């Protein structure tokens, strides 16, 4: 069984304190500029993913990039653990859900780091697609 809301921190006091500190950063740091920069690099990665024959449904919303490895599969696909190990072997924390690979980078990510993630997603498509 999958715990579908594993990333929810609803009303957790520590998470609320972190959220407050995060809002303070928006006042003191160029956060929107960082978001725009990450989104632009992700757009370049999207074009690369869309061109790969073993990936389907490549898409981007803001800084989030996702694609399905292979042409068939679903959220409950057993490919997820294999993909997780594949990315971990490359020192990348990329969380697949079934055969869908999501890339949700922190806003401090560099071009080189994002490109390494895109490269790994393409390698995974070659290996598992």
Regions from the language model: what does each represent?
Residues 1-129:
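Conserved N-terminal phosphate-binding loop of PLP-dependent enzymes in the Aspartate aminotransferase
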């Amino acid at each position: 069984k999958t715990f579908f809301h594993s990333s929810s921190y609803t009303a957790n006091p520590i998470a609320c304190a972190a959220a407050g500190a995060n809002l303070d950063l928006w006042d003191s740091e160029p956060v929107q500029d960082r978001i725009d920069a990450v989104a632009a690099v992700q757009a370049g990665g999207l074009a690369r993913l869309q061109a790969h024959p073993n990936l389907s449904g490549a898409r981007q919303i803001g800084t989030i990039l996702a694609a399905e490895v292979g042409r068939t599969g679903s959220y409950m696909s057993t490919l997820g653990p294999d993909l997780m190990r594949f990315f971990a072997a490359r020192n990348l924390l990329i969380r697949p859900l079934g055969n869908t690979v999501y890339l949700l980078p922190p806003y401090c990510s560099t071009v080189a780091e994002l490109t390494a993630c895109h490269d790994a997603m393409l390698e995974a498509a070659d290996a598992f697609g």
